């Protein structure tokens, strides 16, 4: 019973993240939605690791790797966002045309 609830929560978080990523016009909001998607994937990894392979912790180790990857993605994304805001004075996605100055 608990397994289904966790999977429902994970699907719900993933759906919110995808919806926010598609409809977002702000780069910060898009980064937050991407982090939400990665966290829902981590929730699935830990849940399935506990359900199928509780002795070897392969899913837990992979989830820690995904958390480290998400932290690096957030740091790089925020630094790029800071540079775009400094040069363009806007963080809106539809106003960012990088092909022409």
Swiss-Prot record:
Protein EC: 7.1.1.-
GO MF terms held by the record: oxidoreductase activity, acting on NAD(P)H, quinone or similar compound as acceptor; quinone binding
What does the UniProt entry say about where the protein is found?
Plastid, Chloroplast thylakoid membrane
Mind telling me which InterPro entries this protein's record contains?
Answer: NADH_UbQ_OxRdtase_chain4L/K (IPR001133), NUOK/Mnh_C1-like (IPR039428)
Question: Which EC class does it fall in?
Answer: translocase
Sorted UniProt keywords: Chloroplast, Membrane, NAD, NADP, Plastid, Plastoquinone, Quinone, Thylakoid, Translocase, Transmembrane, Transmembrane helix, Transport
Instruction: Specify the superkingdom.
Output: Eukaryota
Membrane topology, from the record: Multi-pass membrane protein
Q: Which Pfam families match?
A: Oxidored_q2 (PF00420)
> What are the TM regions of this chain, as residue ranges?
2-22, 32-52, 61-81
Under the cellular component aspect of Gene Ontology, which terms does the record hold?
A: chloroplast thylakoid membrane; NADH dehydrogenase complex
Which catalysed reactions does the entry list for this protein? Answer: a plastoquinone + NADH + (n+1) H(+)(in) = a plastoquinol + NAD(+) + n H(+)(out); a plastoquinone + NADPH + (n+1) H(+)(in) = a plastoquinol + NADP(+) + n H(+)(out)
Q: Which Gene Ontology BP annotations are present?
A: ATP synthesis coupled electron transport; photosynthesis, light reaction
What main location does UniProt list?
Answer: plastid
HAMAP family associated with the record: NDH1_NuoK
What does this protein do, in the record's words?
NDH shuttles electrons from NAD(P)H:plastoquinone, via FMN and iron-sulfur (Fe-S) centers, to quinones in the photosynthetic chain and possibly in a chloroplast respiratory chain. The immediate electron acceptor for the enzyme in this species is believed to be plastoquinone. Couples the redox reaction to proton translocation, and thus conserves the redox energy in a proton gradient.
User: Subunit structure of this entry?
Assistant: NDH is composed of at least 16 different subunits, 5 of which are encoded in the nucleus.
- Family indicated by similarity: Belongs to the complex I subunit 4L family.
Task: Report what the protein is called.
Answer: NAD(P)H-quinone oxidoreductase subunit 4L, chloroplastic
Species name for this entry?
Zea mays
């Amino acid at each position: 019973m608990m397994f289904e609830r966790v999977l429902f929560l994970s699907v719900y978080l993933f759906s919110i993240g995808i919806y926010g990523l598609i409809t977002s016009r702000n780069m910060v909001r898009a980064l937050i939605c991407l982090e939400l998607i990665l966290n829902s994937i981590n929730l699935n990894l830990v849940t399935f690791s506990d359900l199928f392979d509780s002795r070897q912790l392969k899913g837990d180790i992979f989830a820690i790797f995904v958390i480290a990857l998400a932290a690096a993605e957030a740091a790089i994304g925020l630094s790029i966002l800071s540079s775009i805001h400094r040069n363009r004075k806007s963080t809106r996605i539809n106003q960012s045309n990088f092909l022409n100055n």
